[in-house]
């Protein structure tokens, strides 16, 4: 039984050495084949194929930094309109009704799911109240008065 394991072990070692030798030959062979391949390329030209010609680069100038950021446009775009700064301390008046504050969104139970219910009709004018929201440049939260 021990002789069987020794024979098996020797076969594995011999196979490994053959494998390493073949790899070494392949690596050395590829090195020499590259030199021969260069000689063949010089002798045979382009192997019967016509080489692919790349198209010439566009004749337009290279893009500027601004064109890279914004992208090139065939027509010149007008400059963007100036933005107005918000007025600090501006008062905004919002009119709401009390029943809108109490509404809760509930998912539909059945039937059409794409139907959105309209808000309830407003109550008479005397029950409405005004909310005034003031804002400032400070980091304090917005204040609301009823």
From Swiss-Prot:
Propeptide boundaries: 25-48, 67-70, 86-110, 131-146
Extent of the signal sequence: 1-24
Transmembrane region(s): none
Localization per record: Secreted
Induction of its expression: By wounding and methyl jasmonate in leaves.
Gene Ontology biological-process entries: defense response
Residues covered by region (Disordered): 47-128
An annotated Gene Ontology molecular function: hormone activity
PTM characteristics: O-glycosylated; contains pentose side chains.
The protein's name: Hydroxyproline-rich systemin
Principal place of residence: secreted
Keywords for this protein: Glycoprotein, Hormone, Hydroxylation, Plant defense, Secreted, Signal
Positions carrying 4-hydroxyproline: 51, 55-58, 63, 79-80, 82, 119-122
Physiological role: Activates a lipid-based signal transduction pathway in which linolenic acid is converted to jasmonic acid, a potent activator of defense gene transcription. Induces synthesis of proteinase inhibitors I and II in leaves when supplied through cut stems.
Positions annotated as glycosylated: 51, 55-58, 63, 79-80, 82, 119-122
Any one GO CC term of the record: extracellular region
Tissues/organs with expression: Leaves.
């Amino acid at each position: 039984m021990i002789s069987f394991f020794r024979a098996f072990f020797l076969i594995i070692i011999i196979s490994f050495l053959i494998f390493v030798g073949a790899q070494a030959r392949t690596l050395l062979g590829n090195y020499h084949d590259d030199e021969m391949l260069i000689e063949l390329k010089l002798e045979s030209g382009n192997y019967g194929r016509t080489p692919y010609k790349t198209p010439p680069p566009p004749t337009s100038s290279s893009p500027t930094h601004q064109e890279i950021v914004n992208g090139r446009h065939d027509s010149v775009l007008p400059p963007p309109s100036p933005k107005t700064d918000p007025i600090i301390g501006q008062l905004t008046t919002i009119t709401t009704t009390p029943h809108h504050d109490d509404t809760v969104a509930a998912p539909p139970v059945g039937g059409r799911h794409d139907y959105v219910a309209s808000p309830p009709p407003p109550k008479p004018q005397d029950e409405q109240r005004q909310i005034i929201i003031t804002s400032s440049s400070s980091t304090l939260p917005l204040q609301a008065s009823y």
